[in-house]
């Protein structure tokens, strides 16, 4: 069975919402849309207080090379433009819009009819992705159009589509593939045209039998797209691991996938590409799994960007004794520090964890068992890196590859002594990165 070669773990899957169809979340009374909800430089606000905007209208422009346009997810009046705390607690510029109906920009095709023929040229597709503010929906939120600005000396041999969804609990991709498989295929065809790659490989874990069967059937009409079942193993969906599993190519340290002739996108991104290329619809909504062991009805909602997280949780119901709410999955997600914040691109899951699940085991001394080393998918030695970080020996951290850590959490998950290994390594990466930055000034 196809998989990456080193390490990996298999946490409890807990895909409680996999059978819950995607529903439209009620339109909120107001939205707060952050201008910096992507990797790179925040977009520059192009509206002012008092302006009336329509759904799909650009309200902030990504003017830097690595940036993305931001659009209104609703129609209404701009009432405030000011710093607003996001779920991490950090303040970012937010545009508050009082909702007045649901009027869409006239240039957007809002019909449910599937548009199959791709009429845009390669460059027009890339330009459309930029115009519509499409970013990677797998979590990183890297502006998609930048990936397809391929240097003239590079060639793309493979377009890889990450449909692994290896994080526990999250089922957004699962539902997208069941309910919007053809739109995803058309989006992938558009990306093939933009990249010049001869083939696209969809990597999907073999625990999704129903999805694999459905995708394989739909893919029969798309000869350049292959569905590739993979072994169920975390972090199968990590970029470098996916590349190794599907192509047997290795991305060198500090390099990007294009160096080995590969571009990687998420299946959710493929759906956003379809909307942009075929419907001229910007990225203004996200499909979010709302789940947890104590959640009465785990669900998948299509939610307008900028919707209040508090409103979403109140609508679903916060279980008693909830100790932590995470954006993303339990392995790589981030805890919400501020519940009075608003959704943004790439927030694929709201996970409510019971107090009993949040308690860490008592930390004891390292027993030198080496399990953290055996599960590291990057071939690092967490057993060495943690004490180096504790001793603030960041030069040695760098020499031992700390910057190659993807922060997947496998080492900490596997540690029988309950040591906060990945927490220390994350800190060490931050300090080491600052040292490297200062050195290169």
Walk through the language-model features, giving the residues of each:
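Gly-rich Lys/Arg/Thr-decorated short loops/hinges at beta-loop-alpha junctions or inter-strand turns
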Residues: 105-107, 136, 159-173, 294
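Acidic low-complexity segments
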Residues: 85-142, 153, 209
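Histidine-anchored nucleotide/phosphate-binding helix
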Residues: 178-194
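Short, well-structured beta-strand-loop connectors
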Residues: 48-61, 80
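N-terminal, Lys/Arg-enriched amphipathic/low-complexity engagement segments
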Residues: 1-46
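Ferredoxin-type iron-sulfur electron-transfer modules in oxidoreductases and energy-metabolism complexes
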Residues: 347-361, 373, 377-441
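Hydrophobic alpha-helical positions that pack around
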Residues: 198-309, 315-320, 329
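Conserved hydrophobic positions within beta-strands
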Residues: 76-78
């Amino acid at each position: 069975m196809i998989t990456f070669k080193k390490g990996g773990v298999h946490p409890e899957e807990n895909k409680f919402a996999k059978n819950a169809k995607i529903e439209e979340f009620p339109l909120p009374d107001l939205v707060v849309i952050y201008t910096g909800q992507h990797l790179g430089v925040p977009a520059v606000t192009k509206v002012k207080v008092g302006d009336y905007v329509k759904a799909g209208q650009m309200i902030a422009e990504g003017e830097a090379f690595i940036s993305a346009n931001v659009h209104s997810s609703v129609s209404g009046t701009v009432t405030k433009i000011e710093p607003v705390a996001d779920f991490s607690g950090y303040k970012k510029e937010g545009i508050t819009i009082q909702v007045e109906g649901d009027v869409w920009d006239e240039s957007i095709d809002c019909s449910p009819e599937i548009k199959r023929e791709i009429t845009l040229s390669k460059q027009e597709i890339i330009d459309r992705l930029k115009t519509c503010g499409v970013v990677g929906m797998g979590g990183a939120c890297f502006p998609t159009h930048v990936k397809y600005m391929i240097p003239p000396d590079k060639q793309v041999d493979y377009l890889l589509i990450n449909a692994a969804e290896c994080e526990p609990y999250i089922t957004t991709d699962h539902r997208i593939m069941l309910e919007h498989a053809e739109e995803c295929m058309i989006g992938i065809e558009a990306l093939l045209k933009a990249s010049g790659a001869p083939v696209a490989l969809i990597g999907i874990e073999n625990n999704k039998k129903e999805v694999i069967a459905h995708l394989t059937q739909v893919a029969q009409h798309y000869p350049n797209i292959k569905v590739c079942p993979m072994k169920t193993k975390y972090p199968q969906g990590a970029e470098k691991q996916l590349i190794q599993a599907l192509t047997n190519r290795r991305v060198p340290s500090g390099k990007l996938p294009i160096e080995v002739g590969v571009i990687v996108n998420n299946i959710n991104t493929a759906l956003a590409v379809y909307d942009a290329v075929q419907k001229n619809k910007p990225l203004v909504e996200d499909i979010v799994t709302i789940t947890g062991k104590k959640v009465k009805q785990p669900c998948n909602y299509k939610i307008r960007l900028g919707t209040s997280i508090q409103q979403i949780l109140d609508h679903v119901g916060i279980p008693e004794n909830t100790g932590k709410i995470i954006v993303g999955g339990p392995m790589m997600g981030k805890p919400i520090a501020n519940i009075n914040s608003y959704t943004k691109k790439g927030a694929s899951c709201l996970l409510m964890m019971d107090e009993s699940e949040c308690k860490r085991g008592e930390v004891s001394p390292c027993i030198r068992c080496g399990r953290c080393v055996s599960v590291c998918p990057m071939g690092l030695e967490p057993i060495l890196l943690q004490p180096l970080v504790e001793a603030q020996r960041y030069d040695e951290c760098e020499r031992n590859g700390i910057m190659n850590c993807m922060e997947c959490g496998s080492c900490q998950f596997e540690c029988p002594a309950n040591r906060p290994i990945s927490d220390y390594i994350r800190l060490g990466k931050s300090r080491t990165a600052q040292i490297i930055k200062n050195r290169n000034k």
